[in-house]
């Protein structure tokens, strides 16, 4: 019975300490006075970035092909 009380007391103490540290960290973030903007990481943003990168690659190859044909160096 004593060991069970001892372990529960230790568990409660460690939980209280970790909760206190989390609250201090949260309060420190709020004290900055500025709103931090979270980066949106959704599947639509990922697809948009992928399409943008693919579009740049295709455009670059088209420009290279057109300049090659116009200059006659192909």
Swiss-Prot record:
Cysteines engaged in disulfide bonds, as pairs: 68-74
Keywords for this protein: Amphibian defense peptide, Antibiotic, Antimicrobial, Cleavage on pair of basic residues, Disulfide bond, Secreted, Signal
Localization, UniProt: Secreted
UniProt signal peptide: 1-22
Cytoplasm among keywords: no
Origin superkingdom: Eukaryota
This protein's GO CC annotations: extracellular region
Example GO BP: defense response to bacterium
Tissue distribution of the protein: Expressed by the skin glands.
Family label: Belongs to the frog skin active peptide (FSAP) family. Brevinin subfamily.
UniProt function note: Antimicrobial peptide.
Name of the molecule in the record: Brevinin-2Ta
């Amino acid at each position: 019975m004593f060991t069970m009380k001892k372990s529960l007391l230790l568990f409660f103490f460690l939980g209280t300490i970790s909760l206190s540290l989390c609250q201090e960290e949260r309060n420190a973030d709020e004290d900055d006075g500025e709103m931090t903007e979270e980066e949106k990481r959704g599947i639509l943003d990922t697809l948009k970035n992928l399409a943008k990168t693919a579009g740049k690659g295709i455009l670059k190859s088209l420009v290279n092909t057109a300049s090659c044909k116009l200059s006659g160096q192909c």
